[in-house]
Amino acid sequence: MLKITIITLGNKMPDWVNSGVNEYAKRFHDGIQIKLIEIPLLRRNKSSDLARILEKESALTKDALPANARLIALDMLGKSFSSEELALRLTQLQQISSHLCFIIGGPEGLSNEILTLCDERWSLSKLTLPHPLVRIILLESLYRAWSIINNHPYHK
């Protein structure tokens, strides 16, 4: 069984986000287990020391990392994939690890410490995406790749 953990920094999401996440998570059948770990954002204001906040959020993220998982940072500068390329990459990764962990940063992104810990960096888009949508786009992209791998009609 493939385990997918998504660690995300963010505050309580609106119902439509949770509905989207739940919809894609339940579409994966018995072969894939999805787990979402939400780390609350630290308070920010105009006088906040963003470097210090990033350092603290980095420590919280590090504490949440599952042991023996392949760590994949979502980062604008990461590698981007077509749906078919992503399906191929997932097939390759399943032979390397049975646990993939995707990390979604906060408004300032991920710290260099977290990026260095990661085995890979992927980009969903060159656009800056709102954090609520990133969760849904990631799960939809993974589901689409899964449907390609399994010849499921969803992709076409």
From Swiss-Prot:
SUPFAM superfamilies in the record: alpha/beta knot
Residue positions binding S-adenosyl-L-methionine: 74, 105, 124-129
Keywords: Cytoplasm, Methyltransferase, rRNA processing, S-adenosyl-L-methionine, Transferase
Gene Ontology annotations for the cellular component aspect, listed alphabetically: cytoplasm
EC number per UniProt: 2.1.1.177
Record bears the keyword Oxidoreductase: no
Entry-linked PANTHER family: METHYLTRANSFERASE, RIBOSOMAL RNA LARGE SUBUNIT METHYLTRANSFERASE H
Quaternary structure note: Homodimer.
Family membership: Belongs to the RNA methyltransferase RlmH family.
Name of this protein: Ribosomal RNA large subunit methyltransferase H
Organism of this sequence: Legionella pneumophila subsp. pneumophila (strain Philadelphia 1 / ATCC 33152 / DSM 7513)
